[in-house]
Amino acid sequence: MAGVAEIMCEYGAGDKVLQLQQFDTMGFYQYYGVTETFKDLQSLIKRAEDIQTSYDKIVIHDYSEFKINFPKNKVVLIFHGSKLRGLDDNEIESVKEYPCFVTTSDLLDILPFATHLPAPLDRELFKKDVEGYGWIAINRSYQRDFVEKRIKEKYPDVEYYERNAGSIIRYEDMPDFLSQYKHYVDWKFTNDAEPVSLPDPSCTGIQALALGLTVHDKDGGTLSPHLLLIHDAKRVVQRFMDEIT
């Protein structure tokens, strides 16, 4: 789930993010200015090992296999989705020994001992501003035929915006892009051979809600503004810090 680490740093949960260049296509490192990027994994891990003595906690997002590179009492694990769904039983068993968080509630089925930590929303960037019209759904290129068909069966007027390497919307430009529209369809799927609808709102769906769009879900309902409080970055980070300290 892109940008979670940077947003959490912005609101007080650390001051540095280490990231592979290939994983930040939306420019979070440029917007928040807390990220060191690396061309290869070996360089990233070495840098993390070199600086870990200066930090009380090492927060690892998704890639739990690297927990063994750091003192056990410092490691905190946060999982976001696809990577966790693909973990084998041995790795799932091993993470039980660490503080674990998941950013969507369905992942509690895999890690029932984890704590649900909603994905944070930066409300300084995403402020109510909508003046647009029409319908938009931002979704993936993978299995597009299946995903687009399912969405348009319920929302026939929606424009399907395919997010791929050539059509990435920069993070700082997302408010302006979304504000062109009045309605956002927030319907995401697993990457299974037969995709399954995901139950929780996506980061983009919450961002659209904060901008004042009407956000529609997979069941034909709309997202409640109360979700903005649940995902508010200040509250999310405070809860996270309370849990790990």
Model regions and ranges:
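Membrane-proximal helix-turn-helix segments that form the acceptor-binding/catalytic region
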Residues: 48-49, 81-101, 179
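Nucleotide-sugar-dependent
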Residues: 186-206, 218-220
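Donor nucleotide-sugar binding/catalytic pocket of nucleotide-sugar-dependent glycosyltransferases
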Residues: 97-127
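Conserved donor-binding/catalytic loop of nucleotide-activated donor transferases
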Residues: 179-181, 204-214
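Conserved catalytic-core segment of nucleotide-activated headgroup transferases in glycan assembly
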Residues: 119-174
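Short alpha-helical donor nucleotide-sugar binding micro-motif in glycosyltransferases
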Residues: 171, 176-181, 187
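A short, histidine- and acid-enriched strand-loop-helix "catalytic/donor-clamping" loop
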Residues: 64-67, 76-90, 106
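N-terminal pre-catalytic "stem/leader" segment of glycosyltransferase-like enzymes
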Residues: 1-72, 157, 216-234, 239
